[in-house]
Amino acid sequence: MTNEEFLQRYDSGKPNFTKDEIEKMAYEEFGNWVDTAEGRTHRWYQEVETIFEVGDRLFAVNWDRGLTEQQENDFDDAEVYEVERKEKVIFTYIRKDTYGND
């Protein structure tokens, strides 16, 4: 599938991507990989979101990564959707030294 074919299918509203096509998106074999976000961890799998770029647009595919050698990666409920980059500021707190600065 070319970038143009992907965009045409996505913009049609009914892309019907195959499992193989979704796997390629998830495994960074289609488009330009941007980021991978690891989500909630369950007993046997972890939720994963792979972000990739096609042309000047950003897309994501969510899928489940198997956490043991007996668990396969799962794409049955995978979804492909367009995303946008947003800045997010996060504050963390560290312990303050309370024993003087000798």
Where are these regions (language model features)?
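Intrinsically disordered, low-complexity peptide-like regions
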Residues: M1, R9, W33, Q71, ...
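Generic cytosolic/nucleocytoplasmic N-terminal low-complexity/intrinsically disordered segments
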Residues: T2, T18, V61, R85-E87, ...
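Negatively charged, low-complexity tracts enriched in Asp/Glu with abundant Ser/Thr
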Residues: T2-A37
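Short linear motifs centered on Gly/Pro in flexible linkers and helix caps
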Residues: L7, N16, E72-N73, Y93
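Sequence-pattern detector for short linear motifs
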Residues: S12, R43, T68, K88-F91, ...
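Acidic, low-complexity, intrinsically disordered interaction modules
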Residues: V34-A78
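Mixed-charge, Lys/Arg-enriched low-complexity segments
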Residues: N73-D102
